[in-house]
Curated annotation (Swiss-Prot):
PANTHER family reported in the protein's UniProt record: BRIX DOMAIN CONTAINING PROTEIN, RIBOSOME PRODUCTION FACTOR 2 HOMOLOG
Protein species of origin: Arabidopsis thaliana (Mouse-ear cress)
Subcellular location field: Nucleus, Nucleolus
Pfam family name, one: Brix
Organism taxonomic ancestry: Eukaryota, Viridiplantae, Streptophyta, Embryophyta, Tracheophyta
Name of the molecule in the record: Ribosome production factor 2 homolog
Length: 314
């Protein structure tokens, strides 16, 4: 297990606070791990998942023999990597005779395994298998639409669980406002049967329509695959209750240098910058300066009169 150290500096304390559970969570980073043995298909799937999540994923290419997500004691390495990388969702790939092309998707809470779902990969098509106009290719880091088609996602418990995990995997950071011009991709999940889901990645093609809202078409850009549900493990009640805890009101931001007084009410401190008096322009309105200006004015008047008299005499 990773050694727990108390922070000795303010920076270390802020880093630990940023990694702690929050009422309003930030975007979830994804950890991609390889098992003892992986097939060529599974390696391609994990590589393309990393490309789709680029900027929000960390991938370890080394094989891990000690990770057994569904076995007791096999979660220790997962929790260690989660704490080390600050990732709250993971993708673990393995290939055996009993479970070929096996992918385990899981979520973490406070660096503990929250829930797990295991799927098998079938009918995988890589990005290179699709031909399309490259100008419609989705840009890196854009927000996706996530579409779930089929009643099974509402009725079947395993499909509902898979829907929650896939949403957390692909949605990225939750934001209040979106720029519609930046929406250029969609993940389409179709429930074929109670245990099988077709997943494909599409680009959004905008076309002219008779109104302000453009008409949208989906262009399949890949990858695409069938996900066959094998095993799943839901979170225990105590962990779920702790993870689902919410606040009725949003936490208020602390106001700096502000106090409440029983008599004066709300009081505050204002820190003014140092005043450089030598560089300040001061208006001199003293009596002495006025007298000097008056004398100069009279002198100028006498000089102009003398010049006029000289010109007239000539």
């Amino acid at each position: 297990m990773m050694e727990i150290r108390t922070p000795k500096t303010g920076k270390a304390k802020r880093v630990l606070e940023s990694r702690a559970p929050k009422l309003v969570e930030t975007g979830k980073k994804t950890l991609i791990l390889h098992g003892t043995k992986t097939s060529a298909t599974l390696s391609s799937v994990m590589t393309e998942l990393y490309r789709l999540k680029k900027g929000g994923a960390i991938r370890y290419s080394r094989r891990n023999e000690n990770i057994r997500p569904f076995e007791s004691g096999g979660e220790t390495s997962l929790e260690f990597f989660s704490q080390k990388t600050d990732c709250s969702i993971f993708v673990y790939g393995s290939h055996t005779k009993k479970r070929p092309d096996n992918l385990v998707l899981g979520r973490m809470y406070d660096h503990q395994v929250y829930d797990l779902i295991e799927v098998g990969i079938e009918n995988f098509k890589s990005l290179r298998a699709f031909s399309y106009d490259k100008k419609f290719a989705p840009h890196e880091g854009t927000k996706p639409f996530i579409c779930f088609i089929g009643e099974g996602f509402e009725n079947v418990s395993e499909l509902k669980h898979l829907k929650e995990v896939l949403t957390d995997l692909f949605r990225g950071e939750v934001v209040d406002n979106l720029n519609l011009t930046g929406l250029d991709r969609a993940y389409v999940c179709s429930a074929i049967s109670p245990t099988k889901v077709f997943l494909t990645h599409c680009a959004l093609k905008l076309k002219k329509s008779g109104s302000i809202v453009p008409r949208m078409e989906l262009v399949e850009v890949g990858p695409s695959m069938d996900l066959v549900i094998r095993r799943n493990r839901l979170p225990n009640d105590s962990l779920m209750k702790e993870a689902m805890r919410t606040s009725k009101d949003k936490p208020k931001k602390k106001e700096k240098n502000v106090d409440q007084d029983a008599v004066l009410g709300k009081t505050g401190k204002i820190y003014m910058p140092d005043q450089k008096l030598k560089e300040m322009k001061l208006f001199d309105k003293s009596k002495g300066s006025k007298r000097e200006r008056k004398d100069a004015k009279l002198k100028h008047k006498e000089e102009t009169v003398a010049k006029k008299m000289k010109v007239s005499s000539e």
